[in-house]
Amino acid sequence: ARLAHLRPKNPTFFAYAATVPARSFKQKNECHGWVGIRLQLHPGAEPSDVVMHVRMLDNDNAQQAEALGILGVNLIHGAFFNHHHPEWVVEGLADGLGSERIEVDLIHFSGPYFDEVENRLMNLHLIRSWLTRAVVFNPAGEVVVPGELFYRKPVMVIRGSFKPVTCVNVDMMAAGLRQFSQLAAVDQNEIVSLAEITMNSLISGDNVDGADFLARIELLASQGYTVMISDYVRFFRLRAYLRRYTQKPIGIVLSVRDFDFLFDEKYYEGLEGGILEAFGKLFPDNTHVYVYPSRPSGGGAELVTLDNVQVPARLRHLLAHLVENDKLLAVQPLDDSHLHMDVADVIAGLRRGRGAWERDVPEPVAQRII
């Protein structure tokens, strides 16, 4: 308005800003910060914003400055020319860079041009575009910066598809937290309860069902969980990701039903040291896996626990070593009435409509689904 009598009749404006500290010569500090653009696409229109949090991965500040410049050009170009397709804005951010130079772990679109943009889906698209390996949502369902959330916090993780959240999921986390909070280095009030979903469980064919993804986020948030979507298939890579931000204890609660997966040597093909390398990277420091029991379906079936779970004969001594050294810890359920539950039966029942499945999920979850 102040320039109305001086400027041409039909200008549009934009402002670009980046606040990222350069890497110090003396210290290998984490280089991360905020980058954003505020733009008009039509003269006199209300502005819209695209803001993102970035991590610079180059080893010196000259390379980082170059990468930040390329990122800025990509953002400005995408915001002006691809604003009708925000997925294209995301996909174009790494043009000329690649994922080895920069990571974008949060992006937020706002303003009149982006009224219909679902920011949670755009952040999921960051993973699909190889701009990050994980995105995090707080219990309010809002996308948050992982480094700020996990910084110096103990973290308890449960991995699953959560389609839907079941009573077993809830009891696993509650029982695991009860034991995890007893560790000397854990302040119960600081624990981050993290439900992790891998991208593999969200993708059907080549596509992600956006409505299904949002429903899972909302159901987990209703139970008070922080949610992380990642493409970390192997547990030790998940642990390494969390170790970027915290040196406090990390706990992973796992059903004994998943031991076939954990102790499957094919799962570790491609690692030079195989399963030994994987477990060495999973348990190097202050990390524990809490093993939750299960009861096979059918009346009178024996409870399967960490003490009697079967693994391949050649791996029994490895299992014994991990148990003896308190790397694998047995969890005592708080509610053993659902130990026989099979999530496949819950899903099948849910598809048929109301029924017995409602007893196998928390009441607030059942009410949301109904």
Question: Which stretches of residues belong to each language-model region?
Answer:
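Nucleotidyltransferase catalytic core that binds NTPs
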Residues: 1-370
